[in-house]
């Protein structure tokens, strides 16, 4: 797995869904290469034993994450770990000049105190005091934070729901085209969003032929969405967010409702707004009025597909967004951030074409 310095990537948490998708993307990457695989539970085992469906040259052994070893073999590290673990490893890597992309929520909040309030269970077992590091971490939404990501040492990749919700919403908050109150987000995602560790609600017998809301009030991603929405709007944003689990493996569809300040704006006007904002961002597609996104249209791709409609009876703006929760909603966005950090075009090594049907 030896590669030229400056292109070497460690993937920690390699056998989880986020790690697996990251490895799959980097195996086809022309410039970045996986040189270290880390994982506590899988340490000491050959890759082919763990993931025979994703062969890697030389069949490397998964290592117990060791900061010194990671720094020896990698220039970048993608951390695909449960919440509360990345914050223990990332500071050690940064001290050793390894640049980090964290796929967990550990550094998504600029305020450590807010993270502790939202992630209470994880926080009670930790003695975190990395206030400054939380402030320095860059929120990894490339379409809105590209220049900051390019020079960052620590990037906190957004959650899947925030990604799908913020991409259509932010342009209208930025330009002051919608009211800041009364925002509602209804989102639906597949079972892979729950990770690879077995959970009862994700069993086939539980999830099949059924749809259910969860985290109806106070879902962790609510405050994450509000944080960037407030920053872009220039004032505090409080919104309602409700996720739903649907019986499919991957895919996420978010519908955002807001009220237009100008009742004369049409769906065509609002579509023009989105197209103008994202015209130089190849990972974003804006559909014509009357065409609405489907999760199948983004499957296995790093695309986000957006659409707009307006109910002129009440000036209600309806924003729709589809992403693959494991790609643009997780690993693909992480690789997009890696590309920017490495001085590469953001889409390097990633397919923007879906597998249909």
UniProtKB/Swiss-Prot annotation:
<keyword id="KW-0055">Arginine biosynthesis</keyword>
<dbReference type="Pfam" id="PF22698">
    <property type="entry name" value="Semialdhyde_dhC_1"/>
</dbReference>
<comment type="similarity">
    <text>Belongs to the NAGSA dehydrogenase family. Type 1 subfamily.</text>
</comment>
<keyword id="KW-0560">Oxidoreductase</keyword>
<comment type="function">
    <text>Catalyzes the NADPH-dependent reduction of N-acetyl-5-glutamyl phosphate to yield N-acetyl-L-glutamate 5-semialdehyde.</text>
</comment>
<feature type="active site">
    <location>
        <position position="160"/>
    </location>
</feature>
<keyword id="KW-0028">Amino-acid biosynthesis</keyword>
<dbReference type="InterPro" id="IPR023013">
    <property type="entry name" value="AGPR_AS"/>
</dbReference>
<keyword id="KW-0963">Cytoplasm</keyword>
<dbReference type="GO" id="GO:0070401">
    <property type="term" value="F:NADP+ binding"/>
</dbReference>
<dbReference type="InterPro" id="IPR036291">
    <property type="entry name" value="NAD(P)-bd_dom_sf"/>
</dbReference>
<dbReference type="GO" id="GO:0006526">
    <property type="term" value="P:L-arginine biosynthetic process"/>
</dbReference>
<dbReference type="InterPro" id="IPR000534">
    <property type="entry name" value="Semialdehyde_DH_NAD-bd"/>
</dbReference>
<dbReference type="GO" id="GO:0005737">
    <property type="term" value="C:cytoplasm"/>
</dbReference>
<comment type="pathway">
    <text>Amino-acid biosynthesis; L-arginine biosynthesis; N(2)-acetyl-L-ornithine from L-glutamate: step 3/4.</text>
</comment>
<keyword id="KW-0521">NADP</keyword>
<dbReference type="GO" id="GO:0003942">
    <property type="term" value="F:N-acetyl-gamma-glutamyl-phosphate reductase activity"/>
</dbReference>
<dbReference type="GO" id="GO:0051287">
    <property type="term" value="F:NAD binding"/>
</dbReference>
<protein>
    <recommendedName>
        <fullName>N-acetyl-gamma-glutamyl-phosphate reductase</fullName>
        <ecNumber>1.2.1.38</ecNumber>
    </recommendedName>
</protein>
<dbReference type="InterPro" id="IPR050085">
    <property type="entry name" value="NAGSA_dehydrogenase"/>
</dbReference>
<dbReference type="Pfam" id="PF01118">
    <property type="entry name" value="Semialdhyde_dh"/>
</dbReference>
<dbReference type="InterPro" id="IPR000706">
    <property type="entry name" value="AGPR_type-1"/>
</dbReference>
């Amino acid at each position: 797995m030896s590669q030229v310095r400056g292109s070497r990537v460690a993937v920690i948490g390699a056998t989880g869904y986020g790690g697996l998708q990251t490895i799959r993307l980097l195996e086809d990457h022309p410039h970045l290469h996986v040189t270290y695989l880390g994982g506590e539970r899988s340490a000491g085992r050959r890759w082919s034993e763990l993931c025979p469906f994703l062969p890697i040259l030389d069949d490397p052994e998964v290592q117990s994450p060791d900061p010194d070893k990671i720094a020896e073999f990698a220039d970048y590290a993608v951390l695909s770990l449960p919440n509360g673990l990345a914050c223990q490893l990332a500071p050690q890597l940064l001290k050793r000049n390894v640049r980090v992309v964290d796929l967990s929520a550990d550094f998504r909040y600029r305020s450590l105190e807010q993270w502790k309030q939202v992630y209470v269970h994880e926080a009670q077992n930790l003695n975190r005091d990395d206030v400054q590091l939380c402030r320095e971490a860059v929120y990894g939404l490339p379409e809105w934070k590209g220049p900051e990501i390019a020079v960052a040492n620590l990037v906190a990749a957004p959650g899947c729901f925030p990604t799908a919700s913020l991409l259509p919403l932010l342009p209208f908050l930025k330009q002051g085209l919608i009211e800041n109150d009364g925002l509602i987000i209804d989102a639906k995602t597949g079972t892979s969003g729950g990770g690879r560790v077995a959970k009862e609600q994700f069993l086939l017998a539980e999830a099949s032929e059924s749809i259910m809301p969860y985290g109806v009030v106070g879902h962790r991603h609510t405050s994450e969405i509000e944080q960037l929405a407030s920053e872009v709007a220039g004032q505090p944003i409080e919104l309602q967010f409700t996720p739903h689990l649907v019986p499919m493996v991957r895919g996420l569809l978010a519908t955002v409702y807001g009220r237009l300040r100008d009742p004369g704006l049409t769906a065509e006007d609002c579509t023009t707004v989105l197209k103008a904002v994202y015209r130089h961002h190849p990972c974003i597609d804006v559909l014509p009025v009357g065409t609405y996104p489907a999760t199948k249209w983004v499957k296995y791709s790093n695309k986000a597909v957006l659409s707009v409609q307006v109910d002129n009876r009440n000036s209600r703006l309806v924003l729709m967004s589809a992403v693959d929760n494991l790609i643009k909603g997780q690993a693909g966005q992480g690789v997009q951030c890696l590309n920017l950090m490495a001085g590469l075009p953001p889409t390097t090594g990633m397919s923007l074409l879906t597998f249909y049907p």
